[in-house]
């Protein structure tokens, strides 16, 4: 929901992320509640779940005001990637100047299972979403990528049921890793597969 600044797929907003990066208040829950308030029935709405992650646009483009007080206190509010991080993604086959989309199967195969362990996995318990960091040239963690995993998919499925939504849709099946996300979604929604 944040897309260019923070998480690509947050279910809820998170107080862990400061306002310095000009992020907005959007989350899946915010959008669903606004549609419901506008009169859309829950039975008319599906929740979209991406079987991919995104490097935030903020990571590859300058533009954050680093003079603000909370700018240096959080991995998400760092300067954009330097040559080291751009080269790291390029070595894995990603030209971040063209696209910041990373399929879930590549997140698992190339990032989470990186033999050099250059990525660290995190979980934001307020936003209900996983994210990865990489090290800066100074050794500080830099927010690198947000994505869905089986845990976040199960939580979103519970949300769908609790809100009485029509169901879920996802993009894209071919990006899944050995059907982990599709299987989790089906199981959590009570769909036999």
Predicted features along the sequence, with ranges:
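Membrane-proximal ectodomain caps of single-pass cell-surface receptors
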Residues: 92, 103-110
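Substrate-binding surface in catalytic domains of secreted glycosidases
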Residues: 1-98
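Short, flexible coil/linker elements and helix-boundary hinge sites characteristic
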Residues: 73-75, 93, 99-100, 114, ...
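Extracellular low-complexity, Gly/Ser/Thr-rich intrinsically disordered linkers
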Residues: 111-193
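Generic alpha-helical secondary structure signal
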Residues: 16, 39, 84, 98, ...
């Amino acid at each position: 929901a944040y897309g260019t600044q923070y998480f690509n797929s947050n279910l809820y907003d998170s107080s862990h992320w400061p306002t310095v990066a000009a992020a907005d208040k959007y989350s899946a829950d915010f959008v669903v509640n606004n549609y419901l308030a506008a009169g859309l029935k829950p039975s008319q709405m599906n929740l979209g779940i991406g079987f991919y992650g995104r490097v935030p646009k903020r990571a590859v483009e300058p533009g954050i005001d680093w003079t603000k007080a909370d700018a240096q206190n959080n991995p998400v509010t760092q300067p954009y990637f330097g040559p080291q991080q751009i080269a790291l993604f390029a070595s894995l086959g990603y030209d971040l100047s063209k696209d910041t989309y990373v399929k879930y199967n590549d997140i698992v195969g190339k990032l989470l299972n990186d033999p050099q362990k250059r990525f660290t996995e995190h979980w934001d318990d307020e936003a209900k979403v996983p994210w990865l960091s990489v090290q800066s040239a100074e050794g500080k963690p830099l927010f690198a990528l947000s994505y869905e995993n089986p845990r976040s998919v199960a939580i979103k499925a519970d949300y769908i049921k609790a809100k009485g939504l029509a169901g879920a849709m996802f993009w894209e099946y071919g990006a899944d890793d050995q059907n982990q996300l599709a299987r989790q979604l089906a199981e959590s929604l009570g769909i036999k597969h």
